[in-house]
């Protein structure tokens, strides 16, 4: 298929829970997909751009979760991180809103920079509850003190984050 995220165990469980009507009818899907750092501009020039190279995986995941194709799509993006990416004709930060035939909404947020690691989350609001697939982190220890709360960072990049999805797909 080439779209491995639907094989991620956490995303697959979220989809199963949705299909099993555990939160009722879906209403609002939010997909967050932030890379830890932008690619080299030389890559950007040949990649097809953020929408075709990066967000395409989120388009597939959204349509897989919603079980249909959208009827309306709107997008906005800008080059906020590196002006050279903009000069190459691409954006590094974007939001897409997709409306489905029955009125469900999907919002996809992409950025080429998240200083804290590879941020990959899904949240879906239903008529009877909320499903969330959170980041896969380096470890699950959370330290809480009077100074604040500290936890591990997300996995660094897609190979580490989606290793189990690649294995499940093949």
Which residues make up each language-model segment?
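Beta-strand scaffold of nucleotide-dependent catalytic cores
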Residues: 26-29, 107-110, 133-135
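A general structural signal for well-ordered alpha-helical segments in protein cores
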Residues: 10-11, 58-59, 167-170
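A contiguous active-site-proximal alpha/beta segment in oxidoreductase catalytic domains
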Residues: 1-40
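Short, hinge-like loop/turn segments at secondary-structure boundaries
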Residues: 16-20, 45-48, 125, 150
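C-terminal glycine/acidic-rich active-site capping loop/insertion
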Residues: 4, 86, 122-170
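Alpha/beta-hydrolase-fold catalytic nucleophile elbow
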Residues: 32, 76, 125
